[in-house]
Amino acid sequence: MKVDNVKSQMRKGMLEYCIMLLLHKEPAYASDIIIQKLKEAQLIVVEGTLYPLLTRLKNDDLLSYEWVESTQGPPRKYYKLTEQGEVFLGELEISWKELNDTVNHIANR
């Protein structure tokens, strides 16, 4: 098994959580999420991965979106967390802290 494969799977597993964290801070246009924020965090994502994930989160009532006129080109779809999304994110944060604590405990034995 290659290390790169494991690292890739770990990143994919955290993608939903990271997107929700970004949208908790402010609504975002999908390309902003792809090009800037996730890339800066070394979570490289292609549109074929991001858009189905955003759609699933929206269908689960965790995200909503609104169309905003653009100064260049067509209107843009800005995503934001719903109230239910905020609650779900809180649950994910608890799970992340528990998982992180567990890994740190094992690593420091």
Identify the function of each model-found stretch.
Residues 7-49:
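N-terminal helix-turn-helix DNA-binding core of bacterial DNA-binding proteins
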Residues 43, 68-70:
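Short polar/acidic secondary-structure junctions
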Residues 50-52, 56-57:
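Basic amphipathic alpha-helical segments that dock to polyanions
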Residues 61:
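Glycine-centered, phosphate/nucleic-acid-interacting loop/turn motifs that mediate DNA/RNA or nucleotide
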Residues 65:
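Short beta-strand "wing" residues that participate in macromolecule-binding interfaces
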Residues 71, 75-93:
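Basic, amphipathic "hinge/linker" alpha-helix immediately C-terminal to the N-terminal HTH DNA-binding motif
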